[in-house]
Design a protein with these regions (language model features):
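Phosphate-group recognition and catalysis centered on beta-loop-alpha active-site segments
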Residues: 1-226
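Cysteine-centered metal-binding/redox modules
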Residues: 227-317
Length: 317
């Protein structure tokens, strides 16, 4: 079963990065809880996502400009901006102690560079992973500790697996995914934990692709999907079955080797009812053409324009 990871200590259910959020994560049967860590002025590790205090607390200014004692005087804000009179800025030590008591694993994100030594001293164990956008920091952490690490990526780079291996990480935390990422990561022994998954529909889709876990603001919502065995998308309604490019596959992890191509001639941008714009490949048939698929099999590094040229050759014959 896939892991459920409570993002920012279940930020949809309590003030983010709070002890109350950790308790809510445990109530929802999350497996791990994700914490964001920054440094106070006097060198204490505290839970805080933003560099600024303005959005999530009753204070203002920068986290690093206040001492722990000053930070402890602040109240945390809920997602709607209201102050939670019970919640104060926790230290990493307090959060780790509570998570251990509630038998929750830890995903600790270093929000700043230079925290490697303090983090290595503060946490340990197989049920703990340290993540960061600062991949060099993860390499340094690996040199001084046995902690597991994971790279965070917000876009989908050309080779995220290589980035993870270069960072000496054992996991990838991507914001965008496709099935190729899961396939290549798993071939290298890397786990994949997409973020931030906040609907059952999205959870079901990502689990079908092969996710090892889901990072979510609402672990109660996602827990239901994660408890179910992943189901293959199937081929019953696929107009391209059997797929020319992958004739022996079972469609469980069907993917396009060109995604995300963002080619206006192959797909299109569509809008949701709420007005959001996203890329859709639903009208693309390029890699399902036999001559294109054959060329791609011989030239796996081919770019979209090369394949479109093959498509036009067939049309002109």
């Amino acid at each position: 079963m896939a892991l459920v990871i409570a993002h920012r200590t279940a930020g949809a259910l309590a003030a983010e990065n709070s002890l109350e959020g950790i308790e809510r994560a445990a109530f929802c049967r999350a497996d791990w809880v994700e914490l964001d860590v920054r440094l106070s002025r006097d060198g204490e590790l505290v839970l805080m996502h933003d560099e600024s205090l303005n959005r999530t607390t009753s204070g203002c200014g920068l986290v690093g400009d206040l001492s722990l004692e000053e930070l402890k005087c602040l109240k945390l804000r809920n997602r709607d901006g209201s102050l939670d009179q019970r919640s104060k800025v926790p230290t990493l030590k307090e959060a780790v102690s509570l998570a251990r008591e509630l038998k929750l694993g830890l995903v600790l994100e270093m929000k700043e560079e230079g925290l490697e030594g303090l983090v290595a001293e503060s946490v340990s164990g197989e049920d703990c992973m340290v993540t960061s956008f600062y991949h060099a920091s993860l390499r340094e952490l690996s040199e001084i500790s046995c902690l597991k690490t994971g790279i965070i990526i917000s876009a989908l780079p050309i080779n995220p697996v290589r980035l993870a291996l270069e960072a000496e990480a054992c996991a990838i935390f991507p914001r965008r995914v496709n099935a190729r990422l899961f396939k290549e990561a798993h071939q290298q022994g890397l786990a994949v934990y997409p973020w931030t998954v906040n609907s059952r529909e999205e959870a079901n889709w990502i689990l079908r692709l092969g996710a090892d876990g889901l990072v979510t603001d609402d672990p109660c919502l996602v827990r239901v999907a994660a408890d179910q065995p992943a189901q293959a998308t199937g081929k019953d309604n696929c107009p391209y079955y059997p797929c020319h490019h992958f004739p022996e596959q079972d469609c469980t992890h069907c993917f396009c080797p060109l995604y995300p191509c963002k080619d206006e001639e192959l797909g299109s941008y569509v809008r949701t009812k709420k007005g959001k714009r996203f890329w859709s490949c639903i009208n693309c048939t390029l890699v399902h053409l036999p001559q294109v698929a054959a060329y791609l099999a011989e030239h796996p590094g081919a770019i979209t324009s090369e394949l479109k040229a093959r498509q036009r050759q067939k049309q002109n014959q």
